[in-house]
A protein has these predicted regions:
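Short helix-initiation/N-cap motifs at beta->coil->alpha
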Residues: 68-77, 170-174, 261-276
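A local structural motif
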Residues: 34, 58-68, 86, 158-166, ...
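Hinge/lid segment of periplasmic solute-binding proteins
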Residues: 94-151, 304-310, 381
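Extracytoplasmic/periplasmic solute-binding protein
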Residues: 132-136, 141, 173-232
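C-terminal capping/gating helix-and-loop segments adjacent to ligand/active sites or protein-protein/ligand interfaces
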Residues: 324, 366-373, 386-442
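Extracytoplasmic/periplasmic substrate-recognition and gating elements
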Residues: 59, 63, 84, 256, ...
Length: 449
């Protein structure tokens, strides 16, 4: 009898185990993902993503349905899609402010393979140590300089500084000393001035009212440990206005043209001046190489084009890197099933780690990828893109993130640009510029609510 009971018990256990495995098998079949959806932000690369989708399905069997929002309609399109059965599994935000709008749909990506391979973790959108947005491309800007002209300066017998190479220029004081001495020696160097013209024509002033202005805003928010997803970004005190003025004055006073004439100058004018070696330096981003190399009569060789951080005279100058960032962050829909979330994470990791995917990223999408999965021969050949990557890989250097995504409005930026032109022309004093920046930031932030 005992033997029979033992056999019966073992039989029941076996039947239970078989039932359990069968149940799990059905669950696995139910959870098997055949497709995911991606809402693409960039219409100009929609066709490339169609190719990528086809390749990925060929290699993995998973279909990536790529939908693309029309220009300037991404937020509206995302909002409409999220309320339907066609909600994207993969979407994007533009930074901390975008995360604040979509945090209920952003999955934790801290343990994702793509985030683990992010070269600089500070570039991600993070909250309380967890990553919710992973940048899929980066761009950067700083002071572009012509190494050949700088070498010519360092070799001058009559130069007034002791500096011998750009490797020694690690703070604003050093930069100022070299720039002002170069301006005095412009005839010997064969230039019209050190810096290209500070383009302050309306519509061409974004390098100053946005890109340069990013520095004091970043410095203030960092100093005060501001939560970038909070309402604390609705006001600023412009605490680092003096530092902004330091570098802006250096640009104005050591230029190829008089400050009073800058109201008609464009970005194209500045890049042409640099390309034709009328100057040694210009502030701009890695996208500028195509402008420089495309200028008729360009004299600047690819091997001579380098980057220097925009030093402004803060205590952190010597550890400051380039301004590197993006307005493009991958997010995985936390409302999708776990299997769908995993499939989305697998897709973006494949795109940035497989040979096929990396070829698309570098050569067809044209991205500078911020991940350590790329070998040297898989990285962009553009000299400024290479400089961005070189600065990112420097030990002890802190990249300046793009906090200008938090600027309250285009009106704020336009007003700031107009005030900078008035300052350059001598019709507005700096204190008035400071007050306008503080007041406009508050009023435009309030109007946006």
């Amino acid at each position: 009898m005992k033997s029979f009971k033992k056999i019966l018990a073992l039989t029941l256990v076996a039947l239970f185990t078989l039932t359990l495995f069968a149940s799990c098998g059905k669950k696995a079949e139910k959870d098997e993902v055949k497709e995911i959806r991606y809402l693409n932000f960039k219409p100009e690369i929609a066709d490339v993503y169609k190719e990528i989708s086809a390749k990925y399905e060929e290699e993995t069997g998973i279909k990536v349905i790529v939908q693309t929002a029309a220009n300037n309609t991404y937020e509206q399109t995302l909002m409409a899609k999220m309320a339907t059965d066609e909600a994207p599994t993969l979407f994007q935000i533009n930074g901390p402010r975008g995360y604040a709008n979509w945090k209920d749909y952003c999955a934790d990506l801290t343990d994702s393979e793509l985030y683990k391979h992010l070269t600089d973790k500070s570039l991600a959108v993070t909250v309380d140590g967890k990553a919710y947005g992973v940048p899929y491309l980066i761009e950067g800007y700083g002071i572009i300089y012509n190494q050949a002209i700088m070498d010519k300066y360092f070799a001058l017998d009559k130069k007034a500084t002791e500096y011998k190479s750009m490797d020694e220029i690690k703070n604003f004081d050093a930069l100022k000393a070299v720039v002002e001495d170069m301006q005095k020696n412009k005839d010997a160097l064969g230039n019209d001035g050190v810096f290209a013209s500070t383009s302050l024509k309306a519509g061409d002033d974004w390098r100053w009212q946005t890109h340069l202005a990013n520095l004091p805003v970043y410095q203030e928010f960092t100093k005060n440990n501001v939560d970038l997803t909070s309402d604390a970004t609705k006001t600023i005190k412009f605490e680092f206005a003096k530092n902004y003025k330091n570098i802006f004055d250096l640009y104005l006073n050591n230029s190829v043209v008089e400050a009073s004439k800058l109201g008609t100058k464009t970005v194209n004018d500045s890049m042409a001046e640099f390309a034709l070696e009328k100057c040694a330096m210009v502030q701009n981003g890695n996208w500028a190489w195509s402008q420089i190399s495309g200028v008729s009569g360009n004299k600047v060789k690819a091997e001579n084009i380098k980057y220097l951080p925009i030093y402004t005279g803060t205590d952190d100058d010597e550890t400051q890197g380039l301004c590197i960032g993006t307005e493009n962050f991958f997010c995985v829909n936390s409302q999708a099933s776990e299997a769908e979330q995993k499939a989305a994470k697998d897709f973006i990791y494949w795109l940035y780690s497989s040979k096929t995917g990396k070829d698309y990223v570098t050569n067809k999408l044209g991205f500078i990828a911020p991940f350590d999965t790329f070998d040297d021969d898989e990285k962009p050949t553009d000299p400024l893109a290479q400089e961005i990557l070189r600065w990112m890989e420097k030990d002890g250097i802190t990249t300046v993130p793009w906090n200008f995504t938090l600027f309250p409005s285009q009106t704020f930026k336009d007003n700031f640009g107009a005030a900078l032109l008035q300052y350059a022309q001598g019709t507005k004093d700096w204190k008035a510029v400071e007050k306008q920046v503080i007041d406009d930031w508050a009023s435009e932030s309030a109007a946006a609510q």
